[in-house]
Amino acid sequence: VDRVDEAYFREQIAPLIKGPGVQFVGEINERQKIDFLGQAQALMFLIDWPEPFGLSMIEAMACGTPVLAFRRGSVEEVVDQGVTGYIVDGIEEAILALPHVVALDRRAVRRRFEDRFSSTRMAKDYLRVYKSLRAPRNLKQVSSRAEPVDAVAATYHPAE
């Protein structure tokens, strides 16, 4: 817990996690995170705000760990229902979905991560875009001689 949040953690969170079944591990480094996520039965991503990406979901799936998440923000773009995890609309639904989440094939979770989020897949996508930009197009030729950039830019009208 960082300094800004210490008082909040001490007053609001710590009393809730003193019982059995909950262990606060604190901050962990990257190596520890891989081990931690890889040994988890699931990542519980039950947040109340519209997270724009949710890197922790991707990190869990990279370790083969399925995700149980509320339908918020980017969750539906990241989690493949019934393959890499389950998307739910509330706590009651999360409780019912948990046995299904932990039963998912962790190898399939990892494979889907590789297919969708790996650096190899992203690099291939970038190459495909670069090659498409390099391909001949039906561009309007402004002039056979070099012109100032402003003059060329003034003739560019993207499709609307």
What residue ranges belong to the model's regions?
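Nucleotide-activated donor-binding/catalytic signature segment of Leloir-type glycosyltransferases, i.e.
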Residues: 8-35
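Short alpha-helical donor nucleotide-sugar binding micro-motif in glycosyltransferases
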Residues: 27, 36-40, 126
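Acidic donor-binding loop of glycosyltransferase active sites
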Residues: 38-52
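Short glycine/serine-rich donor-binding loops of glycosyltransferases
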Residues: 54-57, 75
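Short hydrophobic beta-strand element within catalytic cores of glycosyltransferases
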Residues: 62, 66-69, 79
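Short acidic/histidine- and often glycine-rich active-site loop of Leloir-type glycosyltransferases
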Residues: 71-82, 86-89
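C-terminal "capping" alpha-helix adjacent to the active site of nucleotide-linked donor transferases
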Residues: 86-107
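A charged, aromatic-enriched C-terminal amphipathic alpha-helix characteristic of glycosyltransferases
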Residues: 102-148
